[in-house]
UniProtKB/Swiss-Prot annotation:
Entry-linked InterPro entries: GrpE, GrpE_coiled_coil, GrpE_head
Lineage of the organism: Bacteria, Bacillati, Actinomycetota, Actinomycetes, Bifidobacteriales
Keyword Cytoplasm set for record: yes
Name of this protein: Protein GrpE
Subcellular location(s) per record: Cytoplasm
Gene name of the record: grpE
Recorded GO CC terms: cytoplasm
Family: Belongs to the GrpE family.
Amino acid sequence: MSDFNKDEYLNDLPDMDDLSGQAAPAAASADSAAAAAGATQEGAAQPAAAQSQENGDSAAADGADKAGAADGKADDTLTPLGQAKKEAAEYLEALQRERAEFINFRNRAQKEQERFRQHGIIDVLTALLPALDDIDRIREHSEMDDSFKAVANKIDKAFEKFGVEKFGEKGEDFDPTKHDAILHKPDPNAEKETVDTVVEAGYRIGDRVIRAARVVVASPQN
């Protein structure tokens, strides 16, 4: 057996630079292979996704076509009499809708017309209130001749014709919603608040008070 020579053994070992040079091409080859595999998988996934979307759209379109075809087929299966009844029912439904809309429009128009009518009456009555108050004072404090009394009665009837109601009388219960108390007078005989004197009459149309009656109120003594 020959003797082991350490120096010869070390000289025969490859250098580190040579090993690095051999490892680098191997690593580069591995990276290239991995990138190629990833690109192949991505390329395969994109057509698959596109195909899936296309299949979904096609299925939806087929469903809509089948639904339309089913409706058309249902109409085709009707007899001429059945088809006529179906069309008549559709026309009747449309006519009923139009009639309901017309009735609603007519009701709104009537309410609007009545509102304008009342506004016109209120404007005229408001302008004539001072004259009406003077007529009431003449009636209360002096006697009217027949001609003047006839004119006053015609005015009252004209306002009644348009739905104007005159209110406010001595002895009626005091109501703050229609009476304007200008004075409260204690009365030992009064059990509750009542109208003692009507200074100016009140007027209303229906439930709407145009002017509250101005009154003197007799109140119970505490």
